[in-house]
Amino acid sequence: MDIYAVAVGRVGVELDAAQLERVRATHLRVQGWGMEKYPMYGVNTGFGELINVIIPPQFKSDLQHNLLRSHAAGGGEPFPDEVVRAIMTVRINCLMKGYSGISPEALQLLATMLNRGIHPVIPMQGSLGASGDLAPLSHMALPLIGDGHVRKNGVTRPTMEVFQEEGLTPLKLGFKEGLALVNGTSAMTGAASLALYRARHLLRLSLLASADIVQAMNASTRPFSHTGNAVKNHPGQVVIARLMRDLTEGTGLMRDHQDIMRAISERTSHSNDVEETEIYLQNAYSLRCMPQVLGVVLETLQMCQRFIEEEANSVNDNPVILDTPAETYHGANFHGQYVAMACDYLSIAVAEMGVLAERQLNRLLDPHINKPLPGFLAHAKTGLFCGFEGGQYLATSIASENLDLAAPSSIKSIPSNGQNQDIVSMGLIAARKTLALCENVGTILSVLMAALNQASHFTEAAKYSAPIRSIHEKLGKVAPRYEDERPMSTVIAQVRGVLLQEQGLALAQSLVNLDLTPDLSLEPRA
């Protein structure tokens, strides 16, 4: 099962019947242990620092419902529906492993809500990332007991109003069920999975922009040769160099290294004196270092995918229910450090794509270094007309903002919960920052690709490689040659709408064959 397909594509989920029987067996085992008063965290104890308080069986439902209500303490704006759907999907997958004590009925109700588009209202703020994402998952779980609010068809309403319309009945939770729903990493992992998907698309766009600008600026083909890149030993660098060759194949705008050497020889007198030519044997870094810069971005995405996918398919509950009370694992599988650090790495990679794009934009616009293109790509009479001067301010501003967002969250632990939670991951903060960075870098790349589309009007457009011509054709339909006749923000928004919506995703995937597994996926069973 693909998280993105469920979260964004609104594909439904179906619970495996055989696995539900395993879930039921574990649930019944926990209910029996609770009645027999075996000491077990969250079954017959208080929560967190209150673990030393023993709770008699007659309060089993009160204990679980109180947990959900008291820990539904999130703040800030609610997550958009697609993030909520990702969170629900990942939590269902964790609980379907059969190690948590949840009832099949609770899982079926959660899946029904997901399939009918009934989305719990989950505020963005409030998670420390250990014990898991308590606040957001409590908000996710409230509707199961008829509490809280849900959003359906974009309208937020009390849960019971929607349940009554849909013929759904809230549950009375048994031993450990509330804890099973909230004590895990599913909020950060759901958000991180969407950030990873978006980062992969941004890498494709970054490659397309890079293949475009080296043609617009008549750059050298030599930096992308296989031989030179292969001796560096990094697989990602070799892949990016290959993709740059693929995306520029057939171009009539780039320069062969031998031709550059020949031109230099023709310009010099071969005397023993120092001579200055106007020919550069090598291009600036933003036209030359894509294999090195984007290669490590590619490998970082691959590493982060492994961390996030493993977490999405993990049992991240506590305690982990095994065959007997004595074997049951009281530990810390709820801790989100893997996801937190994956998101921090991912944030740096996404921010670096923004840095590269902003520098490429500057090289395309700066009248001192962008010859033979007009300054700021003004269509005529530069100075009277400003061209993309204003667009550069937006890109540079966002690139600077990104430097703050890329600072790590996973090392910013603050003790809480009576010193019980004395080292936490801040994983959801890291995931939220990564999502914000993806939005920001999407805007920077939109400015760059709008400018590259404008640059094609000042070059021999027919000489671009076929993949880049297809991009120009697509963008030209919504953003024709810019002549200062409309607000620059309109141009950027139109280009962004093409690049970052489904048609842009499909086009980029068809043009850029990244060496990544197709989708972040969930295993169907334990």
Curated annotation (Swiss-Prot):
The modification 2,3-didehydroalanine (Ser) is found at S131. The keyword Cytoplasm does not apply. CDD domains: PAL-HAL. There is a cross-link at A130-G132 (5-imidazolinone (Ala-Gly)). It catalyses: L-tyrosine = 3-amino-3-(4-hydroxyphenyl)propanoate; L-tyrosine = (E)-4-coumarate + NH4(+). Substrate binds at H71, N183, R288. It comes from the Bacteria. Keywords: Isomerase, Lyase. SUPFAM superfamilies: L-aspartase-like. Contains an active site 4-methylidene-imidazol-5-one (MIO), which is formed autocatalytically by cyclization and dehydration of residues Ala-Ser-Gly. Its EC number is 5.4.3.6, 4.3.1.23. One of its GO terms (biological process) is toxin biosynthetic process. InterPro entries: Aromatic_Lyase, Fumarase/histidase_N, L-Aspartase-like, Phe/His_NH3-lyase_AS. The active site is at Y41. GO terms for molecular function: ammonia-lyase activity; L-tyrosine 2,3-aminomutase activity; tyrosine ammonia-lyase activity. Has aminomutase and, to a much lesser extent, ammonia-lyase activity. Primarily, catalyzes the rearrangement of L-tyrosine to S-beta-tyrosine, which is probably incorporated into secondary metabolite myxovalargin. The aminomutase activity exclusively produces S-beta-tyrosine. Homotetramer; dimer of dimers. Belongs to the TAL/TAM family. This is Tyrosine 2,3-aminomutase. It comes from Myxococcus sp. (strain Mx-B0). The gene is tam.
